[in-house]
Amino acid sequence: MQDILGSVRRSLVFRSSLAGDDGTSGGGLSGFVGKINSSIRSSRIGLFSKPPPGLPAPRKEEAPSIRWRKGELIGCGAFGRVYMGMNLDSGELLAIKQVLIAPSSASKEKTQGHIRELEEEVQLLKNLSHPNIVRYLGTVRESDSLNILMEFVPGGSISSLLEKFGSFPEPVIIMYTKQLLLGLEYLHNNGIMHRDIKGANILVDNKGCIRLADFGASKKVVELATVNGAKSMKGTPYWMAPEVILQTGHSFSADIWSVGCTVIEMATGKPPWSEQYQQFAAVLHIGRTKAHPPIPEDLSPEAKDFLMKCLHKEPSLRLSATELLQHPFVTGKRQEPYPAYRNSLTECGNPITTQGMNVRSSINSLIRRSTCSGLKDVCELGSLRSSIIYPQKSNNSGFGWRDGDSDDLCQTDMDDLCNIESVRNNVLSQSTDLNKSFNPMCDSTDNWSCKFDESPKVMKSKSNLLSYQASQLQTGVPCDEETSLTFAGGSSVAEDDYKGTELKIKSFLDEKAQDLKRLQTPLLEEFHNAMNPGIPQGALGDTNIYNLPNLPSISKTPKRLPSRRLSAISDAMPSPLKSSKRTLNTSRVMQSGTEPTQVNESTKKGVNNSRCFSEIRRKWEEELYEELERHRENLRHAGAGGKTPLSGHKG
């Protein structure tokens, strides 16, 4: 029976088609055939075991949908609003992106196509799994909307964090950028372009882990539709690459441009170009000039170089996400400031440790060998720079330089040096060979070559050396084993150091002259007139009017002065205004002459021109002794604790 009906139907369909082709009157027959076909289709007797070859295959049923409930509004996405939801079966929190469906019949076909695109996208994203990618769970279509169920990430987006906390420090930027590149690398390896990377689409959880979200503009890239690539423009203008704005076709490199713009957003706290242009003006500017956004000046050199690699105007010259993960800005490996000195001690043929030497102990021994009384002069040098010399085995006497040796500069922290007492106690305990080896004044005749780095610090400290030592340093004159560094505060002083000390003595005497001027007596004025006969008495305050009476003449001035002369003068000549006892002590010092001082030029001329200098001096001393005796008698009468002003005994 079924075979008969099938043959009748086929014959009727064939005849109706022939009648239609011939254009004859077959309207009644065709209508009759159509009624038979419709009745057969509506019948449930199952006439056909297989569908006709021209009909599409039946669509597979979707997996059971998730039972969920919509909660509060938490944000707005690219295609609609985002709500918080809950899985009613597991209690898991969800993020539900709701896309409204337009009810208008005019845009019905366009809306249905857009919905199919989103469904295909979510079906694709359900297969992705990565720590830095938001997990998609599925879609649920309703009468007026399409709901996309996603993993809920607490904490908010990067843009919301920038509004709350301001711009991020560079360590935070590095951490977020590295995770962003890891997620983007995973997407690109799976043939997916994000095409809308920005701070608002990067979510951060409470542990600082970021997730790439809002793949509303992403698309499975098996082929780029045409040879020129994708032709649609999606995304936000401030983060758009020039090729996206110009619609010349773009690929994964457009996401790299957006990564660079996102780094600038995190560093400044604002979208790129937002301070210079509005959105429409930014589109025109980027499309016309292909310029990258301004790079903040306070970023590190590695960060600036990273941005330049991301924001190259030529898409083919931008680095991929995999290559950017190896950039020093992301890895944290800073470039060496001095690449020429990167060789370590062990890379050289004969490391210095084989000689039983230590750099710090060697420098400490150099400091201990100095003959100064303390480390004060050493500390004034600032930092001690020396050259680490790698000795080599040779038949010739001494050590030399090799081509492979490196000149590593060492800066010694003065806190590591021993204190003054240990230096003083260890001066005599140092080995003669060690002193000889590390004597910087010796030339190549010793077993070590000496090299001074001509840096500003060393040149400044070299001025503290004595003249004959500086000449040895420049001309390379060899010195004996006992030669050592001697600074300006040492016990042995040269004639060149005499000038500097002379200036200090003059300033000290000028200060004391002002004090003695207040206690001028007729006896002192008489002595001054005898010492300076050509200078009027009114010019007393403009010259060094006082000089100790026991100073020798110019022929007796010593060539070398001990280093303790300043301290002796300061201790022996206190201010005479304090008490009469100090005045007496000052008078005794003026007679004793234990510490010689320098005589100024005006006094020298006065001594040479005065023929009766010795007689006047003897007379002055006698009168001074008489005045002192009268003062002692007054003190004895007044009592042991009595104090009588010196002004009461004038005349």
UniProtKB/Swiss-Prot annotation:
All copies of domain Protein kinase, residue ranges: 68-330
Residues reported in the UniProt entry to bind ATP: 74-82, 97
Cysteine pairings via disulfide bonds: none
Reaction equation(s) it catalyzes: L-seryl-[protein] + ATP = O-phospho-L-seryl-[protein] + ADP + H(+); L-threonyl-[protein] + ATP = O-phospho-L-threonyl-[protein] + ADP + H(+)
Cellular localization per UniProt: Cytoplasm, Cytoskeleton
Tissue specificity of this protein: Expressed in roots and flowers.
Residue ranges, annotated region (Disordered): 573-608
GO biological process annotation, one example: protein autophosphorylation
Active site (catalytic residues): 196
InterPro entries: Kinase-like_dom_sf, MAP_kinase_kinase_kinase, Prot_kinase_dom, Protein_kinase_ATP_BS, Ser/Thr_kinase_AS
Membrane-crossing residue ranges in chain numbering: none
An example Gene Ontology CC term for this record: microtubule
Keywords on record: ATP-binding, Coiled coil, Cytoplasm, Cytoskeleton, Isopeptide bond, Kinase, Microtubule, Nucleotide-binding, Serine/threonine-protein kinase, Transferase, Ubl conjugation
Cross-link type Glycyl lysine isopeptide (Lys-Gly) (interchain with G-Cter in ubiquitin), residue numbers: 108, 110
Assigned EC number: 2.7.11.25
Function noted in UniProt: Involved in cortical microtubules organization and stabilization by regulating the phosphorylation state of microtubule-associated proteins such as MAP65-1.
Subunit architecture: Interacts with NACK2 and MKK6.
Stated name of the protein: Mitogen-activated protein kinase kinase kinase 3
Annotated organism of origin: Arabidopsis thaliana
